[in-house]
Every structure is written in C-alpha cells, then in structure tokens.
Amino acid sequence: AQIGRLLAFLEERGMTDNTMIVLLSDNGASREGGPQGVMDEWSFFNSEWENVDEIVANRLDYIGTKKAHSNYPWGWSQVGNTPSRWYKSQTYGGGIRDSLIIKWPKEIADPGAVRTQFCHISDIAATVYESLGIEQPKTLNGHEQMAMHGESLRYTFGGPVQGNKRGPQYFEMMGHRAIWSEGYKAVTFHDQNVPYENDTWGLY
C-alpha cells in the first residue's frame, strides 16, 4: 500500500517519467522454523524444539500476535526458494538470490523486460551515482571514505545486451562462502565445528 501511495504521489506531480524507482526484496525464505515450524523462533537458535501437539492444542491462535515469534517449517522454506537451493543466511541461491525491479520510464528503453545479467546489492549505489553524473565522494565530514565495490547497471538500461560487464563477486555469510565469476559460482556450506580448509565446494 505504501509503494502505491508513493507511485500515486509521483504521478500527481508529473514526476514519474524521470524518477528511478528501485525495488529489491530482502533475502530467501528462512530456516529458523526448523523441521516442523516454531511458535518462538528463539527455540531454533537455542536448539530447544517445541512440541507441535502442544502448540496446536494451546497456542495456535497466538500466531500473528505479540505472544508469538513464529516461523514456518523447512518444507515451506524450500517451496519458497524453489528452484534455488537452501535458505536465508546461506550463500546458495535460496539465501541470496532475490528479485530486483528498476523502473525509470525516461531512461529504460523497454519497460517490463527481463534482464539476466548478474548484479549485486553493491551495484545499486554505483548505478545511482552514474545516473546522477556524480563521483563517489572521497571524504565525508573530513573522514576518508572506502572505495565502492559495486558496478553500475546503467549498461542494461538501453535494451537487452550480450554478456555481463561485472567482475568477480565474493560472498560470505556466517562462514558460508561463495564466489561468482563469468556465469560460474563456487559455493560451500560451512559447519562451525569444521576447519575452513575441510569445507566441500560445489561449482555451478
């Protein structure tokens, strides 16, 4: 509803055509519900699984209220992340691959079209900077700033293009690691009780 209010505001003021709107989802479906779902998500983090029969008998109506911090079971997480593998907090596609929508009628040649180039969250700021025609500031309030790692997505705005201009991208989340380069992705699941050098990698 709030997105609709924003779009209506821009339309009323004739600002729609020259406004870039970026809509990005958060992450993949979570795994904190465990194999059978939980009424209190902290039970997952504390490895204290709740009794499903007790939940159904006594606490089912708590879902959606302040008395619950519920989460769905792994089966629904897998459905939500299909066709990608695994869950939120992991570096497989099920955890980190999300939808990105960019609307800018004045600059995007074919609205509604789908792009398949790889992009990363760090590319959004670089895209905004290039679109505004400005450079990243070297300092802010007297403090030196780190260089951005993202690449602008402007090259995709003019229509479908061949290839991908982006260089390698490394990911890490809670010890799980992955690296993407030229359409290939190497990824590993890290068990916190196992040395990193013993992790098994897969190539996709």
Sequence positions of predicted segments:
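Short, flexible, mixed-charge acidic loops at enzyme active sites
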Residues: 37, 97-99
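Generic beta-strand/beta-sheet core signal
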Residues: 22-25, 33, 87, 101-103, ...
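A long, amphipathic alpha-helix that forms part
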Residues: 1-19, 29-31, 35-77
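Secretory-pathway/luminal and periplasmic proteins that interact with or process carbohydrate-rich
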Residues: 28-36, 159-166
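Short, glycine/acidic-rich hinge or "gate" loops at secondary-structure transitions
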Residues: 14-22, 139-146
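C-terminal cap/loop subdomain of S1 sulfatases and analogous C-terminal strand-loop tails that border
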Residues: 66-94, 107-117, 121-204
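Beta-strand elements within well-structured catalytic alpha/beta cores of enzymes
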Residues: 3-6, 10, 19-28, 99-102, ...
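Residue-level preference for short coil/turn positions at secondary-structure junctions
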Residues: 15-17, 96, 199
